[in-house]
Amino acid sequence: MMKRYTIILAVFLLFCTVFTFQIKARPYERFADVEKPWIQKHSMDSKLVPANKGNLIQAEIVYQSVSEHSDLVISPVNEIRPANRFPSHRKSFFAENLRASPPVVPVAVDKYAVPVANPMDPENPNAWDVTLKITTKAVTVPVDVVMVIDQSSSMGGQNIARLKSAIASGQRFVKKMLPKGMATEGVRIALVSYDHEPHRLSDFTKDTAFLCQKIRALTPIWGTHTQGGLKMARNIMATSTAVDKHIILMSDGLATEQYPVKNVTTADFIGETGNANDPIDLVIQGAINFPTNYVSNNPSTPLTPNYPTHSSKVGRRNLPESKFDYSNLSARITFDGVAGALVYEPRFPHPYYYYFPCNAAINEAQFAKNSGYTIHTIGYDLGDFALANNSLKLTATDENHFFTATPANLAAAFDNIAQTINIGIQRGEVTDFVAPGFIVKNLTQSGDVTHLLNVSNGTVHYDVSTKKLTWTTGTILSSSEATITYRIYADLDYIQNNDIPVNTTSAIGPDLGGFDTNTEAKLTYTNSNGESNQQLIFPRPTVKLGYGVIKRHYVLVNKDGQPIQANGTVVSSLSEAHVLQSQDFFLPSGGGHIVPKWIKLDKTTEALQYYSVPPTNTVITTADGKRYRFVEVPGSTPNPGQIGISWKKPAGNAYFAYKLLNYWMGGTTDQQSEWDVTSNWTGAQVPLTGEDVEFATTENFGSPAVADLHVPTTNPKIIGNLINNSDKDLVVTTNSQLTINGVVEDNNPNVGTIVVKSSKDNPTGTLLFANPGYNQNVGGTVEFYNQGYDCADCGMYRRSWQYFGIPVNESGFPINDVGGNETVNQWVEPFNGDKWRPAPYAPDTKLQKFKGYQITNDVQAQPTGVYSFKGTLCVCDAFLNLTRTSGVNYSGANLIGNSYTGAIDIKQGIVFPPEVEQTVYLFNTGTRDQWRKLNGSTVSGFRAGQYLSVPKNTAGQDNLPDRIPSMHSFLVKMQNGASCTLQILYDKLLKNTTVNNGNGTQITWRSGNSGSANMPSLVMDVLGNESADRLWIFTDGGLSFGFDNGWDGRKLTEKGLSQLYAMSDIGNDKFQVAGVPELNNLLIGFDADKDGQYTLEFALSDHFAKGGVFLEDLSRGVTRRIVDGGSYSFDAKRGDSGARFRLSYDEEWVESAEVSVLVGTVGKRILITNNCEHACQANVYTTDGKLLIRLDVKPGSKSMTEPLIDGAYVVSLQSPATSSNVRKVVVN
C-alpha cells in the first residue's frame, strides 16, 4: 500500500515540476489568428546549389512525421513558410487553459482636417488634408529581443544583395520595435553578429540610432558559427529581467562551426533516423553522394577523412549543456579551409563519426528554449535547400516561428516577427464614409487606392457609389501610430443645391459649427490579447468653405424666351439649355480673391454676400460664325444680376439668355430671295415655326439685307414677330400663305414693307394675323389683278366687268399702274336706277374697305399688269351696315368687297342677321355674252358673266365655292327691314384660292367631277349650242320645297342666257341651289335662249345608288332614269319658260334586265342595235361636244347614221333603264 502511494506522489510531483517549468518559461503568450499557407512543392530530385556552402543534393525524401531516433517533429521541406505569410500560433495546453491574459495594449483613434496651406491648391482652395490616426500605447509586459545576424562570406561577393537587404531590413525592424527610440516603453534590443565566431555588437538598449549604426557596419567574413551566435545571445539574455524574451536568428545557409564537445564518446553521435526530411538523414545522404562537398577534417589531425555510409553517425542535437566547451566563446572545432557540413572525427573507427554543426546549433537553441526564450529563425535566400531549411526550422521554437525569405522580402519576415513580439493591434479595419458635399482627390473609380493616398501601413479600398474608404491596417505594433491621409475638396455645386446640415456640437474644427467631413469613421479591430470585434469611433472634423465661385452660363433660348437645345427642343430649365459659350467666372475687385475665379468668403456669417454680375458680352459669336444677342427672359439673370454666395451656399450661378441673331440677309446666287435656303439667313438656319423673322440692318448686324424675302408657295409659314427696319420687302407670293402670330415692327415704313402678290393665273397670296388686336396699324402693298377689258369678239356686250373690293382700309385707285383707261364704279343700293355710280361715291373721297366696286379697262386685249394698293391692312372683324331701300330697283341687294388679305369662309366666317338671306351671290367676271358654249366648244376660263348663288349650309359641296377670295365681291339680299349689320369674322379667314369653279369652268361639258357631297345631291348641267347653266339639288328631311334660308340660293336671272332652276311649290321662287326634303315631284324649270337641241348632264351622289331616280319630260311625255354621268337630250324653242321636268325617286326600284344596246360601225356609218325591252335614244357627238345626229331606236330594232367622215365620235344612249350610256366609236 505504501508503495502505491509513493508512486502516486512521484507522478504528482512530476506533473507539478512540468507545470512550474511551463509557467516560468512562458508566463504570457499572445497570438494572432492568421491563416497558415504552404509554399509550392518542389521536385524531389532538384539540385540545390547554395552559394559558398558546397554542392548539396537533396536525396530521395521519404515523408515521416516523427523521427524514430529523435524527440523532435520534422516537417517536410515543402511546408516551409514564406516570410510574407504569417501563420497561427498554437498555444500549449497550459498557456491555453491555465495562464491569465496580460493587460490589453491601449488603443486610441483621432481624426483631424488641416486646410491646405498656401500656395492654394489650384484645383480648389477649399481643400483639406484629412488624417485618421490610430495610436497604440506601450506593451503591457516588458520585452527584450536579441537579433543574431549572419555575416558569413556567403553574404558578400556576388551575393552582396543579401547583406544589403539584411542591413536595410534589420534597421527597419529596429525602428518598428522602437518607434519612439529611447522614449519607447517596454522594449529593448541587443545585437549579435556571427561569422566563424560570434560578435557582441550591443547589449540591451533603446538607442535606435546606435543599433542602426551597428547594423550598417556588418561586413562579410568567412565561416558560419551559428552555435556561437546563439550562445552569445543566451549570455546577453541571461541579464534580462523582461517577461517576454525573444531571439531572432537569421542565416543564409548551413552552420560550419561549433563548440568542442568535452570527453567525446561514440554515445555523443547518432545514426540515420529513417525520416528522409530530418537534417541527420539529409546530411548523411548528401555526404554519401558528394563526400568532398560535405565532409571536412578535424584540425587536431591531418588525416584524410573517411566518407560516410548509411551506417555512419553524426553529432547528436540533444547533448546536455555540460558537454560543450564554452571556455573560449570563439573556440571551434574547424578552421578555415576545411569547414563543412560534417567534420570527421578520426578517433572512432568504422562506421565513421562526424561532428554536425547544424545539430550543435539546434542543441544550443534548445538550451535557450529551456530557459523560456522564444526563438525565431529566418532561412535567408535558401530556396529549396532542404537541409538548411529544416535545420533552421528545428532551431526555432516551433515551425510557426520559422520564416523563409529572399533579399526582396526579408523585410516582411522581420515585420512578421515584430508583429508576434510587439502587438498593439492584431488586425484592424477602418471604414470611413466621406460626407456628402466633399470629394476625395484622385479617387474616381472603385478598387484598391492605396497608391493614391498617404498610408503608413495596410491597404485602402474605395467604393465610388457609397464614398466609403476601407482601410485594412493589418497588425499595428505597440507604441506606434498608423495613419492614413487623404485630401478632400468641397463639392461646391452639391453644397449649393442640397441642404447640408452643419454640426453645431463638434469641438475639433478646424471650423467649429461647419460641415462634417465624414458621416462616420470607425475602427474595428482585434486587440493585443486576440479579442476580436473591438470598436472605436473617430471624431468628425468640421470645416467651413473659405472660397466660393459665381459661374456665368451663356445659354440658348427661343423666340418665346424658352430654354432650348441646339435642335430647338424646349427644355424645362435654363440649366438644361444648349450652351453657347463655355462658362466663365465672375471675380470682383479687391483683395483676398484668387484669380481666376475664387471669391473670398466671410466665415463669420451665413448671410449671403451679394455681387453685381454682368455677362462678358451682350453679343456672342460662335465658331461657326453665328451671332447671338443677350435677352432677358423669365428665370434668366438680368444685366447685371445680383448673385449672392456664402460659406453655406458657395456656388452662385448666373444664367444669361441669348437668342440667335438669325436675320434675313438673302443674296444666295440664283436663290437670293428664297425663304428655305439656309445660306440666306445670318444664322445659317431657316427659322422654326413660330420664331421671329427679322431683317438684317447695319444697326443689328453690321450689314443690311440685300434681297427681298419671299414666302414659298409650297410651304406655308407661321412666324412670331416680323421685324423689318431694312429697305427690303417681305413678299407674300401668289398661292403662298403667311401667318404672323406676333406683331409687326416696322420703324421704316417708307421702305421695306409687306407686299402681297397677285397675278392672272394664280391666287393672291394669303396674309393672316393670329393676334389682330396688336396689328391694327400694319401697312403694306397688296396687288390686284383686273380681268375686265373691252372684248372685241365677245358678242353684243363687249365690255367685261370685274367686281372687287379694295385690300386696304381706304385708298385712291392706282390708275397709273396699268396701261389703258379704267372705269371704276361703286354699287349704291339706295340709288334708284343704274346702281353702278362713279367711284368714289359721295360722301366718300376715297375707295373704302368692304364696299363693292366694278372695274373695266378700255384696252382690247386681256390685261397683264397688276395694280398696287398701298395703305393700312384691314386686320379686324368687319361690321357692315346693310340697307334695304323701298321704292328702288334691286331693293336690299348689297354688294360687299372682301378687303382682307385672306379668303372669307362662307359657312363659318359670315354671321348673317335675320333680315338677310343666308346666301352669297358670286359674280363671275366677264361680259353678258359669256358663260356659254359657242359652236359646241367651251370658252376660255376667264370668260364668265353671271351670278352664282351659294347658300351658307351647302358651301363647299358638289363644286359649290366654300370661300370668297381676297378682293372678290359678293352680293347678299335683305328680305325685310330697312337696315341691319352683317359681321365677318377675321379669325375664320382661309387661304386664298382661285374662284372655286366660279370662273365658268363649272359649266363643263359632260362634267364627271361632282366634288365632295356630304348630303344626297343631284347636280344638273344644261348644255345648249350657245349657252349653259347649272342647278344644284340637295335633299334633307328637315327642309321644305319652299325657301329655306341658308340652304336655298335664288336664281338671279339674266337675259339672253339659258336658265335651269328648281321651282318652289309656292310662289314664284326660282332656285339655283335648292334644298328639298326629297326629289319626288320636284319641278325643274328651263328657259331657252335659242331654238335648238339641249342636253342635260347628271352628277348623282352615291346616296341614290339604291333604287332609281327618274326624270319626266313634261313636254315630250317621256320618262328616263337618271344615272351618275348620264345625260338626256331634248328640243326647246326660244321663249320656252317654266316647268319642263319633274323628278321622282323610287327607293325600291330594281333594274329588271341587263341593258343590252350595241354600238358598232358599218363602213362609215354608226350602227345602233337595241336588244332591250325599252326604246332608246342615241345622240352622236363630236369629241369636242358638238351634237351631230339624234336617233330613236325601238326595242328589238336597229338604226344607222348617215355616212360620217373618218374620226372619233361619242354616242350617248338614253333609256329608262340605261346605266352605262356613253360609248366611244372610231369611224375609219
Curated annotation (Swiss-Prot):
Subcellular localization(s) per the UniProt record: Fimbrium
Disulfide bonds: none
Keyword flag Ligase: no
Gene Ontology CC: pilus
Residue span(s) of domain VWFA: 144-267
Pfam families tied to this protein: VWA_2
Alphabetical list of InterPro entries matching this protein: VWF_A (IPR002035), vWFA_dom_sf (IPR036465)
Keyword list, A-Z: Fimbrium, Signal, Virulence
SMART domains attached to this UniProt entry: VWA
Extra remark: The name (minor fimbrium subunit) does not indicate the abundance of the protein, but is derived from the greater length of the major fimbriae. In strain ATCC 33277 and strain ATCC BAA-1703 / FDC 381, major fimbriae are 300 - 1600 nM in length and about 5 nm in diameter. In contrast, minor fimbriae are only about 80 - 120 nm long. This length difference is observed only in a small number of strains, including strain ATCC 33277 and strain ATCC BAA-1703 / FDC 381, and is due to a loss of function mutation in FimB, a protein that restricts fimbrial length in other strains.
Subunit record text: Minor fimbriae are composed of a structural subunit, most often Mfa1, and the accessory subunits Mfa3, Mfa4 and Mfa5. Fimbrium assembly occurs by linear, head-to-tail oligomerization of fimbrial subunits. This is mediated via insertion of a C-terminal beta-strand from one subunit into a groove in the N-terminal domain of the following subunit.
Biological role stated in the UniProt entry: Accessory subunit of the minor fimbriae. These filamentous pili are attached to the cell surface; they mediate biofilm formation, adhesion onto host cells and onto other bacteria that are part of the oral microbiome. They play an important role in invasion of periodontal tissues and are recognized as major virulence factors. Fimbrium subunits from different strains have highly divergent sequences, and this correlates with pathogenicity.
Protein name (database record): Minor fimbrium subunit Mfa5
